[in-house]
Structure formats: structure tokens, C-alpha cells
């Protein structure tokens, strides 16, 4: 009886939510709303860096091991072959750093479909450790989303944007994906992009400008894209990219940092995540293209405003790279007048974000690092001279009706490095001697010493600094509504609201609200007035890791509630209310040991089902909870 009751309740809830989310009709006569059947919306998922499976498209015999590579064998990520046949695995992963072609003996290509982004290394042990979008898709199924309504658009995350289009026609295919979704389901799509996937989507929007006649560009966007959720977007780059370039980042894999560096520097996409200055812009290729004259490559350089040279560190918290290089050669006369200590004293050079993006760093260490020439080649050919636009320039708000920028915050994040020669041959010729972290209110070194710099009250998500994540706050208008609410389910007693907060363009906006200790909050910055017919929102999730944010149940709950709110013709506000958050699923119910009953008695009840192993597992949504979403209108 218990099992049947659970099945009936679960089915009833799913059917109810399916009707509410997917079957609603809109009658709102507002330009920001999609006019039509919301059951016809599609979801387009663009994964981040290293978040798509790569499969072999070669036959490679690996000596000294029975594990060879055959067509469609998993390459990224197969830890078994990585451990037993690392040289073969390396050949299937590496690219030529100059022309981005495959290794002569092995080539890999991105997998397709949703399975390519759910688990990178499927298996009983490795699967849970390499999960990316699996939990996201579980929510889609639980809330009754149709299988053809969610579309993944994997890509070869090793390539630069120009090579993605040149080799795979990726952006042509992405355009067709949007058009197919519209034709198949009859409505526009919602874009979910994570990490570098946002860079891919931004490039697509700029590429689309040159693909579609200017007078049809905005119309195409309105017809095909209802909302854009930018999750963990490195809008001004990530310092980990330059760390990977100089010393290698292993991502916890059983490879040396030198091997990781060789791979990373063969991928031109590593530079796509390079930090850059908010004060420097490139030529507007769009207007040059339609003005009748082709832009000269030698003129497509950075143009920086006065603030770049008046402010420190290109607006970042500190100099991103501080590197020791051997002293320059001196004449014999000068050598006589120098002590041995002075003669051996290395030179410490510091570089800002602008000096990383324009190649100054690589030119300075060109004589000491064999990778510098290759990096300069990639930087100029694939980014500075990109035929669409220079991706290493600050973002403007995408011309989409509804934009939601979402990221984690308040975690200790790397913002700068000290490098020195290691005395070892390439690729291990640099060693990190110190790391600078941003903490709330200060910058500290790896040893805990306070460092001078532009420290802010908010920090990043452990991977991308706050300065880069929060750039989207510049997309908000002069008046912003701020709401801070606890991340867990709550009754509204700890919700803080400030309306019409002044926001000066170019400056940060921070919620000046008191937080209870040991409580994680989510802060909403919302603006629906500054741009007629458009909505912009920024969500800051406390203590949410960059790589895990797409698995956050809090994020998924808020996303579904916002979409549920949007489909309601009787919605009284532009954004879903934050006044209260109750359980939405059986998994949200739990046992309150202090009261010896299920928490949230209004929504949950104790209902044992065969196989339950603890009290909390027997707490389930009540049969009467099907109308619980009505409070969010």
C-alpha cells in the first residue's frame, strides 16, 4: 500500500507540475513575454571547458598494453586508458599548436547528444566523480519536461572559436539547432550555458550578426531565444588559464603538471579564458564589415581608455603574473663592479590583465620559454585577428529579452601568481613560488601574509575571481531591486529586500544586508525597467563552487520557479517572489529530530514505503501539495 501511495503521489505531482510548467498559456500583453504556448519552449545546453566527452576517430595500436584505441572509444574521459596507455591517450588528445590539427596517429571528436555532457567517465566508481549535467537532466525528467525539449550542443572544447566554425561548422549547426527547435516545438528556446560555454554563446551572437542581415538580427533573436541563463561565466577571463599555460593544471587526473601543460598549450581554447582588462576594446568588426571596407589586421588592436593607465592592475585585485627571469647579460666592465650576489639576482616582472591579453607577457619571456612563440602565434592569429571579433574584450549585455547571470561567491579564489625558473627542462621549467588569493576584505598569499591590492568585500567561486564573474552587474540599470534570501527552504522571516537601489554604471553594487551566521544566502539583483521590454537579473549564490554550480539544487529550484512564474498570465511582478520557499519534491522533505516529525508539515508528511532505510526517506510531499506553486505567481 505504501509503495502504491508513493507512486500515485509522485505521478500526481509530476503531472501537475508538468501542466503548470509546460502546459501554461500566456495572456500577458507585455513585450518581455513570449506570446504563445509555453509547452513549446526548448532548452539548449552549452557545456563548459572540458565538459564534453571526446571519442576516438582512429585506430591506434598501443604497445605494452592490451588497451588500444578504436573508433568511438572514449578518450575524454577514460581514466582506465589514461592510467594504462598514457602515451596513446596523449596522442589522441593533443593538437598541433600552430594549426590546431590532430596528431598524425590519432584524432578525437566530440560526442553528440545529452549523454556527451552528463557523465564524462561513466562507471560505478568514476561516474559520480565525473558528473556534470546529470542532476540537471534528472530535474527535467522529474518535472515532466519532454525528451525532445532539451537539446545539448557539445563542441570540441580544445579549439578556438574560428577553428570550431572552420573545422566543424559549429556555429552554423548551432543556428540550425535553434531553428529546428522552433520548427519542432513551435516556440523559442532557453539557453543554459556554463563557464566557457558562455564564451561560445557570446561568439555565436557576434557571428550571427555577420550571418543575418542587420535589420533581421534582433527579430531572429526574439523569435528563437526567450531567455539566457549565464551560469559561472568568466566574463573577464580566469586567472587559472594563465596558470595552466605556464605550469599546467591537472584537474585531479593522474598526469604530471608538465604533461598537462603540453596539452593545455596545444589547445587554442586555453587562451579563450585568458584574463583581460575591462578598459580595453578591439575594433568593431561588425561595423567595419558593413561599411564596405575590410579591417586591416594590423589595425585590429586594443584601444584602452584613460582609466586603464590611471588605475592599478587593470581593475583586477592585483597583478596576475609576477615572474622571475634570469638577469640580462652584462658587459665585462659592469661585471667587475658587481658582486656575485648582484650578478645572480633575477629580475621580477609583473603583468596586468591587459599585458596578458595583448601578449606582453609572452614577449617578455620569449627567450626563456619555448612555448611563448607558439602562444603569441595563437593569440594573434586566432584572437586578435579573429574575423568576427576579438573575444578577449569586455562583454556588453546580450541583446536578448531575458538575461540571468548566475554565479557562486564568497569562496577563497586565486587571483595572482609568483613564478620562478625551476631549473628543470621544458615543460617543467617554471615553478609557482606563491599564490595570491582573494578573501573577503583582503588579499592573502599562500602563507597567509596580507598582500596589497584592490581587495573587495566579495570573492569568487574558487575558480573564477569575483571581478570577472560580477562584470554582468554592469548590465543592470540605474535602479536595482535587491533581495537576499536563505538558500534552503524558508518561511520568509529571514528575507531582506531593498527597492530602487541606485547603481552607477561601471561600479559594483553590493547588498548591504545582515547575514545570519552559518546560513547560505542567495542574493538577487533585478532590473526590468531600464531597457524597455527586457529583463536583467544577477544571482549570487553563497559558497557555491564553480564546477558544482550546475549540480546545485538551489539553482535548479530557482530556475524552475522563475520559468513557472513567467508562464503565468496572472503574474503580478516581473520576477518570481522570494517571500517564501517550500519543498517542491519528495527529496526536499526531511525528518525534524527536534520535533520528532517531518519538517514542513504544511507540505510534507510521514509516509513509509517499503525499502525506506531512515526516517527522512519516509517524509514525502502531501497529496494536497499539487497547488503549492500557486503561491509563486
UniProtKB/Swiss-Prot annotation:
Membrane topology designation: Single-pass type II membrane protein
Domain of life: Eukaryota
One matching Pfam family: LCAT
Transmembrane stretches, start-end: 7-29
Location in the cell: Microsome membrane
Mutant lacking the gene: phenotype: Early leaf senescence. Strong reduction in total sterol esters content in leaves and seeds. No change in flowers.
Main location: membrane
EC code(s) of this entry: 2.3.1.-
Any one GO CC term of the record: membrane
Record GO biological process: leaf senescence; sterol catabolic process
Spans within the Lumenal topological domain: 30-633
InterPro entries linked to this entry: AB_hydrolase_fold (IPR029058), LACT/PDAT_acylTrfase (IPR003386)
Induction info: By senescence.
Single GO molecular function: phosphatidylethanolamine-sterol O-acyltransferase activity
Topological region Cytoplasmic: 1-6
Keyword Iron among UniProt keywords: no
The entry's keywords: Acyltransferase, Endoplasmic reticulum, Lipid metabolism, Membrane, Microsome, Signal-anchor, Steroid metabolism, Transferase, Transmembrane, Transmembrane helix
Residues spanning the signal sequence: none
Active site: 195 (acyl-ester intermediate), 461 (charge relay system), 505 (charge relay system)
Similarity comment: Belongs to the AB hydrolase superfamily. Lipase family.
Purpose: Involved in lipid catabolism. Essential for sterol esters biosynthesis in leaves and seeds, but not in flowers. Plays a role in controlling the free sterol content of leaves. Catalyzes the transacylation of acyl groups from phospholipids to a variety of different sterols. Prefers phosphatidylethanolamine over phosphatidylcholine as an acyl donor. Not active toward neutral lipids. Highly specific for position sn-2, which in plant lipids is essentially devoid of saturated acyl groups.
Name of this protein: Phospholipid--sterol O-acyltransferase
The organism of origin for this protein: Arabidopsis thaliana (Mouse-ear cress)
Lineage: Eukaryota, Viridiplantae, Streptophyta, Embryophyta, Tracheophyta
Amino acid at each position: 500500500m505504501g509503495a502504491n501511495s508513493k507512486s500515485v503521489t509522485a505521478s500526481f505531482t509530476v503531472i501537475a507540475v508538468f501542466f503548470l510548467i509546460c502546459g501554461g498559456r500566456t495572456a500577458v500583453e507585455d513585450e518581455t513575454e513570449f506570446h504563445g504556448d509555453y509547452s513549446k519552449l526548448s532548452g539548449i545546453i552549452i557545456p563548459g571547458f572540458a565538459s564534453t566527452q571526446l571519442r576516438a576517430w582512429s585506430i591506434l595500436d598501443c604497445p605494452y598494453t592490451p588497451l588500444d584505441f578504436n573508433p568511438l572509444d572514449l578518450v575524454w574521459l577514460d581514466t582506465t586508458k589514461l592510467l594504462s596507455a598514457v602515451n596513446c591517450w596523449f596522442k589522441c588528445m593533443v593538437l598541433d599548436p600552430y594549426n590546431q590539427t590532430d596528431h598524425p596517429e590519432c584524432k578525437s571528436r566530440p560526442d553528440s547528444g545529452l549523454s556527451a555532457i552528463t557523465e564524462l567517465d561513466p562507471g560505478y566508481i568514476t561516474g559520480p566523480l565525473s558528473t556534470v549535467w546529470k542532476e540537471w537532466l534528472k530535474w527535467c525528467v522529474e518535472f515532466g519536461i519532454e525528451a525532445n525539449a532539451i537539446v545539448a550542443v557539445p563542441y570540441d572544447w580544445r579549439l578556438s572559436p574560428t577553428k570550431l566554425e572552420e573545422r566543424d561548422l559549429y556555429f552554423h549547426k548551432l543556428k540550425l539547432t535553434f531553428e529546428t527547435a522552433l520548427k519542432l516545438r513551435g516556440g523559442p528556446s532557453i539557453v543554459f550555458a556554463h563557464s566557457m560555454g558562455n564564451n561560445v554563446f557570446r561568439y555565436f551572437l557576434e557571428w550571427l550578426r555577420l550571418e543575418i542581415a542587420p535589420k533581421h538580427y534582433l527579430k531572429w533573436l526574439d523569435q528563437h531565444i526567450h531567455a539566457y541563463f549565464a551560469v559561472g561565466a568568466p566574463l573577464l577571463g580566469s586567472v587559472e588559464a594563465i596558470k595552466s599555460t605556464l605550469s599546467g593544471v591537472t584537474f585531479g587526473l593522474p598526469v604530471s603538471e608538465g604533461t598537462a601543460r603540453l596539452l593545455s598549450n596545444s589547445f587554442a581554447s586555453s587562451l579563450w579564458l585568458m584574463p583581460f582588462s575591462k578598459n580595453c576594446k578591439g575594433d568593431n568588426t561588425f561595423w567595419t564589415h558593413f561599411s564596405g571596407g575590410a579591417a586591416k589586421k594590423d589595425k585590429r588592436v586594443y584601444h584602452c581608455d584613460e582609466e586603464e593607465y590611471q588605475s592599478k592592475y587593470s581593475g583586477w585585485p592585483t597583478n596576475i603574473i609576477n615572474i622571475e627571469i634570469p638577469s640580462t647579460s652584462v658587459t665585462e666592465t659592469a661585471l667587475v663592479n658587481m658582486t656575485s650576489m648582484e650578478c645572480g639576482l633575477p629580475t621580477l616582472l609583473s603583468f596586468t590583465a591587459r599585458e596578458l591579453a595583448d601578449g606582453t607577457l609572452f614577449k617578455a619571456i620569449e627567450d626563456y620559454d619555448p612555448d611563448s612563440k607558439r602562444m603569441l602565434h595563437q593569440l594573434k592569429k586566432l584572437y586578435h585577428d579573429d574575423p568576427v571579433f576579438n573575444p578577449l574584450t569586455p562583454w556588453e549585455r546580450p541583446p536578448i529579452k531575458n538575461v540571468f547571470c548566475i554565479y557562486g561567491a564568497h569562496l577563497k579564489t586565486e587571483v595572482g601568481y609568483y613564478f620562478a625558473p625551476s631549473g628543470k627542462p621544458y615543460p617543467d621549467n617554471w615553478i609557482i613560488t606563491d599564490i595570491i588569493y582573494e578573501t573577503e576584505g583582503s588579499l592573502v598569499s599562500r602563507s597567509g601574509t596580507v598582500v596589497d591590492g584592490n581587495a573587495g568585500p566579495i570573492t569568487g567561486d574558487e575558480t573564477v575571481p569575483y571581478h570577472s564573474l560580477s562584470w554582468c552587474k554592469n548590465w543592470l540599470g540605474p535602479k536595482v531591486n535587491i533581495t537576499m534570501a536563505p538558500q534552503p527552504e524558508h518561511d520568509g522571516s529571514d528575507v531582506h529586500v531593498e527597492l530602487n537601489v541606485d547603481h552607477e554604471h561601471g561600479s559594483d553594487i553590493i547588498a548591504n544586508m545582515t547575514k545570519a551566521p552559518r546560513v547560505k544566502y542567495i542574493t538577487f539583483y533585478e532590473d526590468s525597467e531600464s531597457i524597455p521590454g527586457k529583463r536583467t537579473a544577477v544571482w549570487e549564490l553563497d559558497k557555491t563552487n564553480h564546477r558544482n554550480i550546475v549540480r546545485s539544487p538551489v539553482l535548479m529550484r530557482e530556475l524552475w520557479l522563475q520559468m513557472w512564474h513567467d508562464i503565468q498570465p496572472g503574474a503580478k511582478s516581473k520576477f518570481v517572489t522570494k517571500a517564501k520557499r517550500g519543498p517542491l519534491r519528495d527529496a526536499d522533505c526531511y525528518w525534524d529530530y527536534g520535533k520528532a516529525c517531518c519538517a514542513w508539515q504544511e507540505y510534507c508528511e510521514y509516509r513509509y514505503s517499503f525499502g525506506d532505510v531512515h526516517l527522512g526517506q519516509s517524509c514525502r510531499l502531501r497529496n494536497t501539495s499539487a497547488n503549492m506553486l500557486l503561491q509563486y505567481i
